[in-house]
Design a protein with these regions (language model features):
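Acidic, low-complexity intrinsically disordered segments
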Residues: 1-171
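Alpha-helical structural signal in soluble globular domains
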Residues: 5, 9, 49, 53, ...
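Radical SAM enzyme core and accessory elements
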Residues: 11-14, 93-94, 313-316, 322-418
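Short, electropositive alpha-helical surface patch
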Residues: 28-32, 37, 194-198, 202, ...
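Structural detector of well-ordered beta-strand residues that form the stable sheet scaffold
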Residues: 58-59, 79, 102-103, 206-208, ...
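Flexible glycine/acidic-rich beta-alpha junction loops that bind and position SAM and/or redox cofactors
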Residues: 68-70, 189, 241-246, 276-284, ...
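Structural recognition of alpha->loop->beta junctions
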Residues: 70-89, 222-232, 288-303
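Radical SAM [4Fe-4S] cluster-binding motif and immediate context
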Residues: 116-273, 291
Length: 418
């Protein structure tokens, strides 16, 4: 999107370190680096390398927006907030040698007339999914662990549906489309209009949504008719007390079985998200959670411990209590970085590993998806992928938190010739 916001006379190249090594010797006038917390350390290394070569560097993204003073030590300018409305001015300031140290988004930018992302900059054949699109931005909820609210505020903005459809028309419709919205149905009225507009295009798509989508039969029916293959649902926990503590008011544990049944009745698969190790969790959480996910026959699921990202209520409360054990951001991708309340770190780490292994065991996979008729091959393939991936991953995570682990996070930068 930043490339699409760049004036057309500026030459843009994109590098994703997961795919291609960065050429630090390439002639470049300006470098833009996007950083999340888990990529911040490597992002700073990239910035420092370019600056040492005399290249101006811009840092943006959730992490620099949350900790601009930290980020400014590694950049010539820091963008706080969303890029729309800021980026063209920044480019002009750079051209006239008037680059400011900080560019802050004062108001939430309009989503009207957003440019089409420049997908042609992606390395060809390097990504399994290139049909990514967003129709909305933000989330109407304010969960304590979520960095979306701290970055975007508790707002929910929608793009004009005709502009979303115009972008859909630029995608390869035979391939799966992924809506990267934080909650595709955060505004049910808008979602219904969007799904109606999608029906003629006969695409297949997946997206994130809250359990609230199951409370509207017409909305679910339209989602299925428009090509929805799966919904990624944040159940988070099967403890009502935990839901209250994390501010997930949209969820009601007693409704979960009915929610799952209703979504599945429309032929839509469910990928469930669960958090293990919340302050109300004891060692029973592992057995209870995996049994629930198996008994509900969830097609796929992820099980994570809380990650206290800077700027979130979770981070602030744990930091105030002295329970954060490291602020080495490179540890935040795969390691337990806080002290659990009702169990030891070792118990939480081993318990989560056990949940993953049990959920993706061959008997569990067969029980959950073996009798499905729709998308059986795809769902079975995803299960086997998770099984292989996490078995490898957990073998590499047996070291303690304080150990020196390699950084294996996405690192993306844009190079600009002005």
């Amino acid at each position: 999107m930043v490339a699409a916001l760049t004036p057309p006379e500026v030459e843009v190249s994109l590098t994703d370190e997961n795919v291609t090594a960065i050429d630090f010797e390439k002639a470049t006038d300006l470098v833009g680096v996007t950083a999340q917390t888990i990529t911040a350390q490597r992002a700073y290394e990239i910035c420092d390398n370019f600056r040492a070569r005399g290249v101006k560097v811009i840092l943006g993204g959730i992490h620099p927006s949350t900790l601009p003073e930290e980020a400014s030590q590694h950049a010539d300018a820091v963008v706080i907030g969303e890029a729309e409305g800021i980026w063209p001015k920044l480019i002009e300031d750079f051209k006239t040698n008037k680059l400011q140290r900080v560019y802050m988004q004062r108001e939430r930018p309009s989503l009207l007339k957003l440019p089409i992302p420049r997908r042609g900059l992606f390395a060809k054949g390097a990504y399994h999914v290139t049909n990514t699109i967003s129709a909305t931005r933000g989330c109407p909820h304010s969960c304590s662990f979520c960095s979306v609210t701290s970055f975007l505020g508790r707002t929910y903005r929608c793009r004009p549906i005709e502009e979303v459809i115009k972008e859909i028309e630029t995608l390869k419709r035979r391939k799966l489309t992924v809506f990267v919205d934080d909650n595709i149905a955060g505004n049910p009225k808008y979602a219904k209009e969007l799904f109606r507009a999608l029906i003629p295009y006969k695409i297949k798509w997946i997206a994130q949504a809250s359990v609230a989508i199951a409370r509207d039969d017409k909305l679910l029916k339209l989602a299925a008719a428009s090509g929805c293959q799966a919904l990624l649902i944040g159940f988070e926990t099967i403890s009502p007390e935990n839901l209250v503590a994390i501010g997930k008011r949209v969820c009601v544990v007693d409704e979960y079985p009915a929610v799952i049944k209703k979504i599945r009745s429309h032929g839509i698969a469910i990928h469930g998200f669960f958090i293990l190790g919340l302050d109300g969790d004891n060692e029973d959480v592992f057995e209870h959670t995996v049994r629930f996910a198996q008994n509900m026959r969830l097609e796929t699921a992820q099980f994570a411990w809380p990650v206290p990202y800077p700027g979130t209520d979770l981070y602030n409360s744990l930091d105030k209590a002295g329970r954060i054990v490291t602020k080495d951001w490179s540890q935040y991708e795969s390691n337990l970085v806080f002290k659990p309340k009702l169990m030891s770190p070792e118990v939480l780490q081993k318990g989560r590993s056990r949940v993953w292994c049990e959920f993706y065991s061959l008997p569990s996979i067969w029980k959950r998806v073996g009798l499905r008729r729709r998308n059986l091959v795809t769902i079975l393939g995803v299960n086997l992928y998770y099984r292989a991936h996490w078995r490898r991953k957990f073998r590499s995570l047996r070291k303690p938190v304080s150990s020196s682990l390699p950084i294996s996070s996405p690192k993306v930068y844009d190079g600009f010739r002005v």
